[in-house]
Structure formats: C-alpha cells, structure tokens
C-alpha cells in the first residue's frame, strides 16, 4: 500500500466503543451492528456474539473487552472500516472500559428507555469525555411497555448536556434505528489522526496467551505501519521481538499484510513471557523508534484482597500458572505466595472488587480445573507503629499487636448511588449502618435522587451492593471511587476453635461493632462446623480478651450398644474408657472446617 492509499484509507476509518450501564442492551446492540454490516454469516449469528467466555453468556454480562473490524457501505457511496470495541459495564471492570476508550475516537452511549441514566452510565461518560471522545447518544429498548424515551432524552440533556436532537431512538432487539446509528457513526465519529510516515506507535490494549503461538496482543496503531518481519521494541521494557503475523478480528482472527494508522488488530511476535507484552505499553520499531511512549490509561490498583488456597495441596504450582495466565490480560490482578496454618500454601490475591474476585475464582475452577478455598476478602490498612515505622496490611492475620500500633488508617471511597425517591430513607439508613458520612444529595427529576456518601471500602466490598439492591427492590445503581485513607478505631478479631487461633478466620472490625460481629460469627460458625466426637468451644477474641463464646456439642457415640442387660460396672468401665478417649482426642484433635465457614465472615450483616 503506498503513502497516498494509507492516507485515503485513514479518512474512512471509524473507531468507536459502546458504553452503557449493565443490562442496558450493549451486547445486543453490538450483535445488531455486526448483523447489519453483514460481518457475520447469518448461520454463525448467536446472541452476545462478542461475549466469548461461557461465564459471560451465563451471567449475561460482558467481562472482557473485544475488538472487531466491520465494513459498512454508507449512503454517501463510500465504504467505511468500523472498529467496534465492546466494553464491560460493571463498576469492577472500569479499567477494561478505560482501555477500550484509549483506542477509540468516539463512543456510542446506550441508555435504557425505561431505566434512564444510572450511576455507571455517568462514570463511563466522564471516562469518555476525559479521553476527548465524541459521544453518540442512543436511547435503547423504546419498544418496552415501560419505555419513556422523551423523559430519558430530557434527562440526557439535563444531566450530561446532550442536545435532544442528537439522540437516536432505537431497539436493538427489534432492529429499530440501527441503520440510523450506522450513518451517525460515519458523521459523528472523527477519522483517526495519525501519520503513516512517522515512526511506529501502537497501543497494546489487550493481550491473551495462546499455548502454540505465544502472546497475541490487541493493538491500535496511532502512527506508522507494522507488518510481518518487522523487529519491534516494547517501550516499557526495551525488549525486542520479530513480528511473525499481523491481522484483524472479524470476529475471527484473519492475517493481513500490514496494519497502518487507525487500524485496530492483533500482532504475534513469538513472545513467550506474559510480562513482556503488558497492556498499556507502546510498541515501536527497533530500528526507528518513537521518541516517547503513548499516554497509557491509568493503572488500576487492586482494592480487595483474599487468600486463594487449592483444596488439594498438589495443585499449588498449577494455581500459580493459572493466575499468571489470567494476569496476562488482566493487568489489575496481583498475587503473591502466602501460607496459612489452617489452609496450607496458597496465594494472597488482589482484585478490583467483589465481582472481579468471584469471576477470577470461577474462571480458575472452570478453565484450569483447580478446586479452591477462598478466605474472606479484606482491604489494605496502613498502620503507623509506636516506633515510627509504617506497615501495610492486606491480610488480617498479619496485623501487628494492638499495643504496638499508634494509628490505623483505612481506605475510604466516594459512593454515588442513584435511587428512586421512595427509597431514599432506606438507602441513607444502610449507609449510616456501614459507617458512611453524608456528602450531598441531588434530585435529578421527580422520581430519582443522586446520593453521595463517603464510606469505608471495607464496608462496601462485602455485600453493600446486594443490600443496596434489596433495600431498593433492585432499582438503585451504584458506583464508587477511592478517595483517601482516614484514621479509624479498628481492632483485629481472632477466632479460636478448641483454643487454637484459626488465622484464616481473623478479620478487622471497627471497635464499636466488634462485640456484635464477634457474637454473630461464633453463632454462625456453630451451625456451619460439623459436630466432632468431642465438644469444641468457639471463641471470638480481641487480643487476650474473649468477647464471645459458644460450644459445638459433641456427637454421642453409643458405646453401650453391644452391652445387653448385664453388669453396671461393665457399662461404667466402657463409659470411662470413652471419656478418656475423648479427652485424648480433644488434646490432639483437628477440627474440620468447611469452605462455608470461611465465607461466614462476610455474611454477618444479613442476620
């Protein structure tokens, strides 16, 4: 392809992604766009075509971003190349969204005609505006009985400042308005600006591992050209590789001769190590490198930590491999080895939030066949000790003794909730109960209120979202972002079984709630831990002080069953022998702890 052809081609490229709150019909709209541009044979068409993971289909959510190239013949007679980058909508996957947006010039903003704008919609809009993207607003599901497209159009104007005339009314399910959206993409989304003659700059926005071909990186070319045979250099690490294949996704992988300015495609360069192709890095040519790397998107730091332990200790190394492979296209997943007296060897793993944690666990169990026990999640606490040193604690078992600590700081988040009017009281009460501090409240219209609170992250990560949904009959939407660490009066609660501390059940709690939580947890454990041959005391302790206790009764084994009638002294002898046996067992006995018991720490608030 000569210089002029590359410039002409660039003018007809449109790169866009679809952003929306969960369940506003994003994946269905992506399906319709694929269908209407004849990108997929009718026989291959299926719902949620871009959601390739089984888990995504089952839960009906998008977890991984996906990029696909489409051809569209517009009414002006030109043929355009569209690159559609599908993104997730859940608050835990914001970083996936920010990655996709870094590769685009425009975004289709999908809003449900019945639900209207939700917290996550706003969060994604601000992300798109930070990336200077053009927005194409679409009100979807207009054929629903509860749809109120006019109210939603008004809302878009009032809350985001979008002109009502620019809004497209559509129903992805019934194929209404799709043609208009495709034409709007041509008009509204700008062509990429970049110089095909300049040194190569390509942004890696995703990567996956193929056991045969090595790392396959999804890239967006900002400047320059790349083709098979080129020697490329990663700007973050300085490592060099030879390109063996470049290609595009249609959604299947299709090798092409070259990728040039504005193209979104994939590159394979015999990269064997996951760390050498980090998402957010810039690729350039080894012999003619670019001066400085592209602005990657912001690195997301894990917020929630938990221990993952294989049920069978032989799987320890397999678990490490599984985590490394998942980490390849999940830059925010972090892990380090950890050992626990109760659970053996495993990994302390960091996640963005609870959904992220569940999904990683489920993927390890499904894709790698490793059965796991997960400990209760915790957040990072900063402790200033009396000797002036500072320690970060992400595992309650490692918390220093209280008498050595001068101050403890915990992370606080700004939680934004959009709630129907009738439930404001219930939501405020929930936030108060979770140690929240009221910041402000805006009425969007007669029906909905935007409430902002500052809440400790440790209260949010457990089951805040579930409780928010049940307190508002499912109508609330929720988004949160980290603000700062603040000092709190926190204590470490230890759980003792049969007098021994179980490190995996320790948790950190605010002193005001310590007694209730300790009491609730020992009662809960009493029902979850199977009865043993001997009585097991379950205690909750802060330091040396026991704050709650209960006993798990022993199973009675009838040692007299073989004793028919007969001598009382014989029976007494058998009972004495049983008693001595139980005492010995109690001294050396191990208490079996089921997985549910480790998760009981989470569910204490439900009682």
UniProtKB/Swiss-Prot annotation:
Its EC number is 3.6.5.n1. It is an enzyme of class 3 (hydrolase). It catalyses: GTP + H2O = GDP + phosphate + H(+). One of its GO terms (cellular component) is plasma membrane. Transmembrane segments: none annotated. One of its GO terms (molecular function) is ribosome binding. GO terms for biological process: positive regulation of translation. Keywords: Cell membrane, GTP-binding, Hydrolase, Membrane, Nucleotide-binding, Protein biosynthesis. It is a peripheral membrane protein. It is found in: Cell membrane. Pfam families: EFG_C, EFG_III, GTP_EFTU, GTP_EFTU_D2, LepA_C. InterPro entries: EF-4, EFG_II, EFG_III/V, EFG_V-like, EFTu-like_2, G_TR_CS, LepA_C_sf, LepA_CTD. GTP binds at residues 23-28, 140-143. It comes from the Bacteria. Its main location: membrane. The keyword DNA repair does not apply. Residues 11-193 form the tr-type G domain. Belongs to the TRAFAC class translation factor GTPase superfamily. Classic translation factor GTPase family. LepA subfamily. Required for accurate and efficient protein synthesis under certain stress conditions. May act as a fidelity factor of the translation reaction, by catalyzing a one-codon backward translocation of tRNAs on improperly translocated ribosomes. Back-translocation proceeds from a post-translocation (POST) complex to a pre-translocation (PRE) complex, thus giving elongation factor G a second chance to translocate the tRNAs correctly. Binds to ribosomes in a GTP-dependent manner. PANTHER family: TRANSLATION FACTOR GUF1 HOMOLOG, CHLOROPLASTIC, TRANSLATION FACTOR GUF1-RELATED. HAMAP family: LepA (MF_00071). This is Elongation factor 4. It comes from Staphylococcus epidermidis (strain ATCC 35984 / DSM 28319 / BCRC 17069 / CCUG 31568 / BM 3577 / RP62A). The gene is lepA.
């Amino acid at each position: 392809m000569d210089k002029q052809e590359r410039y002409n081609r660039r003018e007809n490229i449109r790169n866009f992604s679809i952003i929306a709150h969960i369940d506003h019909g994003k994946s269905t709209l992506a399906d319709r766009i694929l269908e209407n541009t004849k990108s997929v044979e009718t026989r291959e068409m299926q719902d949620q075509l871009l959601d390739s993971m089984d888990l995504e289909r089952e839960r009906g959510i998008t977890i991984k971003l996906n990029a696909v190239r489409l051809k569209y013949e517009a009414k002006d007679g030109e043929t355009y190349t569209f690159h559609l980058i599908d993104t997730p909508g859940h608050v835990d996957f914001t970083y996936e969204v920010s990655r996709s947006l870094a590769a685009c010039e425009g975004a289709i903003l999908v809003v449900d005609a019945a639900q209207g704008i939700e917290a996550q919609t706003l969060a994604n809009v601000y992300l798109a505006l930070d990336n200077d993207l053009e927005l194409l607003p679409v009100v979807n599901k207009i054929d629903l009985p509860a749809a109120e497209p006019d109210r939603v159009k008004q809302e878009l104007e009032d809350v985001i400042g979008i002109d009502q005339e620019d809004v497209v009314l559509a129903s992805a399910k019934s194929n209404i308005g799709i043609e208009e959206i495709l034409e709007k993409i041509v008009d509204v989304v700008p062509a990429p600006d970049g110089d095909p003659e300049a040194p190569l700059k390509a942004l890696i926005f995703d990567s996956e591992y193929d056991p045969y071909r090595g790392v396959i990186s999804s890239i967006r070319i900002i400047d320059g050209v790349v083709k098979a045979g080129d020697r490329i250099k990663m700007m973050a690490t300085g490592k060099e590789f030879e390109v063996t294949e470049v290609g595009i996704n249609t959604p299947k992988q299709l090798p092409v001769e070259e990728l040039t300015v504005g193209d979104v495609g994939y590159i394979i360069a015999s990269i064997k190590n996951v760390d050498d192709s980090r998402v957010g890095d810039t690729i350039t040519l080894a012999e003619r490198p670019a001066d400085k790397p592209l602005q990657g998107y912001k690195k997301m730091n894990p917020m929630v930590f938990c221990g993952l332990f294989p049920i069978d200790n032989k799987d320890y190394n397999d678990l490490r491999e599984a985590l490394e492979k998942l980490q390849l296209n999940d830059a925010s997943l972090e892990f380090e080895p950890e050992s626990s007296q109760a659970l053996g060897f495993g990994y302390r793993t960091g996640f963005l939030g609870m959904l992220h944690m569940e999904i990683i666990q489920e993927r390890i169990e499904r894709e790698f066949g490793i059965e796991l026990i997960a400990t209760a999640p915790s957040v990072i606490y900063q402790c200033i000790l009396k000797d002036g040193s500072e320690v970060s604690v992400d595992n309650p078992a490692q918390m220093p003794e209280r008498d050595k600590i001068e101050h403890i700081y915990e992370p606080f988040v700004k939680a934004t909730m959009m709630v129907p009017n009738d439930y404001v009281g219930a939501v405020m009460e929930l936030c108060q109960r979770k140690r929240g501090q009221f910041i402000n409240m805006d009425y969007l219209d007669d029906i909905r209120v935007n409430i902002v609170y500052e809440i400790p992250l440790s209260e949010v990560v457990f089951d805040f979202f579930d409780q928010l949904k049940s307190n508002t009959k499912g109508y609330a939407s929720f988004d949160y972002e980290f603000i700062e660490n603040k000092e709190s009066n926190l204590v470490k609660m230890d759980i003792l079984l049969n007098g021994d501390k179980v490190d995996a059940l320790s948790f950190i709690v605010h002193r005001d709630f310590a007694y209730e939580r300790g009491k609730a947890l020992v009662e809960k454990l009493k029902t979850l831990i199977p009865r043993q041959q001997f009585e097991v005391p379950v205690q909750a302790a802060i330091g040396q002080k026991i704050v709650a206790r209960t006993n798990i009764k022993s199973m009675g084994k009838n040692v007299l069953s073989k004793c028919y009638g007969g001598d009382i002294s014989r029976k007494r002898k058998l009972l004495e022998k049983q008693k001595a046996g139980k005492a010995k067992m109690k001294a050396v006995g191990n208490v079996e702890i089921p997985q549910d018991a480790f998760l009981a720490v989470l569910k204490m608030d439900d009682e």
